[in-house]
Amino acid sequence: MDILLVLRAILYRLRQGCSWRTLSIFGHWETIYGHWRRWVDMGLWEQILAEFFMRARGKLWGIDSTSCRVHKHAFGGVKGADYQDIGTSRGGSNTKIHALCDAKGKIIDIFLSPGHRHDSNYAELLCDDVPKGITILADKAYDSDRLIQFLKERDVKFCIPSKRNRTSARKVNKGHYKKRHHIENAFQRLKEFRVIATRYEKHRENFLGIVTLGAILAWI
């Protein structure tokens, strides 16, 4: 099957939110899905996004998370919901997307977690490859001694408001902090894709691949 046709089918599903079987309008849906799974298993989408990481622009980068509702068809994956990054919070069953974006609002790194996990648990993963001299913008949910120390050890600056329980609140550059809207806008663009706004995938690798592909398309 022509690879360009396979890509067209995958992009069609990304935008329409249809099932894999619906892609039979492009050819054998099993063949299309087979290509997709091979690319996911190869880590192809993560490799491509890593290339864009090297092209990240500006000095003010942001980290944040957003929750995606989980459709009932996404349940039943091997090893249970938690292993598949599906959790339960007030809003019901959901998966969290944790992301790092550059100063232009382009996502350059992504992790998934069950919806009930706290954002700060994934901050170090997102910031692990951030180069010296970059300023990380984040809301007060990320205010933790551990993360602050982690960033300082790497000579990475930060603009993170203090939580109320801080005995002494740190000063925050309000002009810098306003730039946090870039990552919020990035999440809005991601959720324009129906299969990201609502998770239909049973397997976390499939959903991570879809989210990563959505982030890549913003660069193209």
Give residue ranges: language-model regions:
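Short alpha-helical elements
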Residues: 1-220
